[in-house]
């Protein structure tokens, strides 16, 4: 049998590239001498590593000495294929641990200063920008609202202008032709400060995918990435051992964001705000709650989106006069599941920042205004983390996600001393800067600090790119400023509008059940409160009405008395108020179990009221006489009578 023709294999190391002519039947350990001839003289032969990808980027790295008996053709290498080589020099191999394959031939350096080898270097794990999705418009599942807005043309139609239009009723000219949803003149005329998300997407898409170019479609949206790329193709060791112009982030130029992911926040009922304010009125401490609701179309803005808040859940927290400390929320997933069965999702967060003015008229101090701040640097960092936890899925982004619909609301005093709601979102750049650990909150609430690479108190090796922003200087000229050490928080903020519906029709009609995690002011959720709300006294409609309370639903879920089907029925009754579904609920085994638990715990419905002695005696019917007994009842018969009376309250 004739010998196989030799092939050319390409090799790349951090010292450069070279080629070798090898036989397909040749085994890998036999290549060691040829490889060492093309490497520096101080290379430790036993440290040679081969990989199909650059060293340190997640490829299949194998020690050359471990490939004994493995031929080149066995692993499928062909003529012209490329392999990557990693190695240690002899001095480094003597000092380094045995399991460490690759180290830099120079000491680790951070901002020019050497980093000790014993130091643990931590990285932020979020996905690299290279993790793009092939054809995201076919794979990514958007929300039904986004799909509906995508199908709309978004044009702003104008009537015929009788003064400027010289054509007939079926004609069209520049004065009456439809406008794009991102038309700047229309936005200025309607005093719309920010583009809606779908308007911005169409504006970017118009420049990215021009019809006249007839090129393949490219997703127009791409989130910023301010971290060192972990998958650099240059072949050097990963950061902080090595860095190049391909993997280091570019300088950041901050500017106000021209669009917003959500345009409006609508509270279904003023009672939602009043219940949160009641805690501050009773304790004087601040309070935080998460907003549960839905996203709907907002017609006041072209292709707009609004968050409709239906419930506020208050997680475990420690409240003080000047701040809030959030504790671990152990039942967060359970609350999210109850909200999901009600057709809701977590749409935002709201917190108070109130201080009584001391006038005795209910007025509060105005802390947030144009000369101070609207959202502090600490609050922006908190909002950024919340938005990073709730990304928005969209098929118009290369990574399948872009921004977040999560909103942040503040209850504080205005210039007139009244309590008002303000709604905000952190910008896309703010979320990425917080994720990349580039900025940190300041003691001065109106400014954000830029991290320093020299600050290694947290044992982190971070790369901080240059950050710039533009401002009007003392000469009235827009000049670029270096953001170090701090810059105004307005560059990281997007304002939203808010309001209440003209005719309130909240999803949950009842709001008298105690709110969770309020033991500090003497309010707690107990079984007696359940009995008080659900006892119908012969009126089943009362129980159906009173079950429409989000806090009651969460409490009943924690009791684990209902099956999944019964709990879904319970949530449907609470949200739709359907009497037919309500009667089905009252006859389920789970409801009977609830009645039994209330009975055995002593939480029984109140007895029928005693007759006033001044009232005339009521005649006793023959049916009632049959229930009378001349002998005293045994404890057993008494409990049976109480059970029958409780059953007659139409709880089941």
From Swiss-Prot:
Ranges of Basic and acidic residues composition bias in the record: 633-643
Cellular component terms per the entry's GO annotation: endoplasmic reticulum membrane; nuclear membrane; perinuclear region of cytoplasm
GO biological process, one term: ubiquitin-dependent protein catabolic process
Keyword presence, Electron transport: no
Keywords: Cytoplasm, Endoplasmic reticulum, Membrane, mRNA transport, Nucleus, Protein transport, Translocation, Transport
Molecular function, one GO term: ubiquitin protein ligase binding
Main subcellular localisation: cytoplasm
Residue ranges, annotated region (Disordered): 601-652
Pfam (any one): NPL4
Origin: domain of life: Eukaryota
Residue span(s) of domain MPN: 265-402
Subcellular location, record wording: Cytoplasm, Perinuclear region; Endoplasmic reticulum membrane; Nucleus membrane
Entry membrane topology: Peripheral membrane protein
SUPFAM superfamilies per UniProt: Ubiquitin-like
Reported function: Involved in the import of nuclear-targeted proteins into the nucleus and the export of poly(A) RNA out of the nucleus. Has a role in the endoplasmic reticulum-associated degradation (ERAD) pathway.
Name this protein carries in UniProt: Nuclear protein localization protein 4
Organism: Neosartorya fischeri (strain ATCC 1020 / DSM 3700 / CBS 544.65 / FGSC A1164 / JCM 1740 / NRRL 181 / WB 181)
């Amino acid at each position: 049998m004739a010998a196989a023709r030799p092939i050319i294999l390409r090799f790349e190391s951090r010292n450069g590239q070279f080629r070798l002519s090898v036989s397909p039947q040749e085994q890998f350990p036999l290549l060691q001498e040829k490889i060492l001839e093309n490497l520096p003289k101080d290379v430790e032969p036993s440290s040679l590593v081969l990989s199909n990808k650059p060293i340190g980027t997640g490829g299949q790295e194998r020690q050359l000495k471990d490939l004994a008996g493995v031929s080149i053709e066995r692993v499928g290498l062909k003529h012209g294929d490329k392999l990557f080589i990693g190695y240690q020099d002899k001095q480094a191999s003597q000092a380094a641990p045995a399991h460490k394959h690759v180290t830099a031939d120079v000491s680790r350096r951070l901002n020019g200063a050497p980093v000790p080898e014993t130091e643990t270097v931590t990285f932020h794990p979020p996905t690299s920008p290279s993790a793009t999705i092939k054809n995201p418009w076919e794979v990514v599942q958007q929300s039904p609202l986004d799909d509906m807005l995508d199908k709309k043309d978004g044009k702003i139609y104008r009537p015929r202008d009788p003064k400027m239009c010289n054509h007939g009723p079926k004609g069209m000219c520049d004065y009456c032709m439809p406008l794009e949803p991102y038309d700047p003149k229309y936005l200025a005329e309607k005093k719309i400060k920010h583009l809606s998300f779908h308007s911005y997407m169409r504006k970017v898409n118009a420049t990215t995918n021009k019809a006249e170019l007839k090129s393949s479609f490219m997703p127009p949206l791409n989130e910023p990435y301010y971290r060192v790329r972990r998958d650099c193709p240059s072949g050097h060791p990963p950061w902080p051992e090595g860095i190049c112009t391909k993997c280091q982030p570019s300088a950041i130029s901050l500017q106000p964001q021209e669009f917003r992911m959500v345009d409006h926040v609508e509270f279904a009922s003023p009672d939602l705000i009043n219940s949160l304010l009641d805690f501050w009125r009773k304790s004087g401490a601040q309070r935080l709650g998460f907003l549960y609701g839905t996203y709907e179309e907002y017609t006041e803005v072209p292709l707009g989106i609004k968050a409709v808040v239906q419930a506020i859940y208050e997680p475990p927290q420690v409240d003080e006069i000047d701040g809030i400390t959030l504790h671990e929320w152990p039942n967060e997933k359970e609350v999210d599941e109850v909200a999901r069965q009600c057709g809701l999702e977590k749409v935002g967060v709201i917190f108070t920042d109130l201080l009584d003015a001391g006038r005795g008229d209910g007025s509060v101090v105005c802390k947030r205004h144009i000369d101070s701040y609207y959202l502090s640097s600490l609050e922006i960092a908190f909002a950024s983390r919340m938005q990073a936890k709730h990304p928005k899925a969209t098929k118009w982004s290369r990574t399948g996600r872009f921004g977040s619909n999560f909103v942040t609301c503040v209850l504080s005093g205005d210039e007139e001393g009244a309590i008002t709601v303000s709604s905000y979102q952190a910008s896309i750049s703010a979320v990425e800067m917080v994720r990349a650990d580039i900025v940190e909150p300041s003691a001065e609430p109106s400014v954000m600090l830029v991290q320093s690479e020299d600050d290694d108190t947290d044992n982190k090796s971070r790369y901080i790119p240059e950050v710039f922003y533009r401002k009007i200087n003392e000469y009235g000229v827009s000049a670029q400023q270096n953001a170090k050490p701090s810059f105004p928080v307005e560059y990281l903020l997007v304002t939203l509008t808010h309001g209440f519906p003209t005719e309130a029709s909240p999803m949950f009609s009842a709001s008298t059940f105690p709110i969770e995690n309020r033991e500090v002011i003497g309010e707690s959720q107990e079984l007696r409160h359940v009995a008080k709300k659900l006892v119908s006294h012969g009126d089943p409609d009362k129980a159906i009405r009173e079950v429409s309370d989000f806090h009651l639903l969460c409490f009943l879920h924690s009791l684990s008395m209902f099956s999944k089907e019964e709990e879904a029925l319970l949530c449907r009754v609470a949200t739709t108020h359907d009497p037919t579904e309500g009667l089905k609920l009252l006859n389920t085994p789970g409801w009977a179990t609830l009645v039994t638990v209330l009975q055995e715990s002593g939480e029984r419905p109140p007895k029928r009221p005693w007759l006033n002695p001044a009232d005339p005696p009521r005649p006793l019917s023959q049916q009632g006489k049959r229930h009378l007994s001349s002998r005293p009842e045994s404890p057993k018969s008494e409990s049976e009578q109480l059970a029958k009376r409780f059953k007659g309250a139409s709880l089941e």
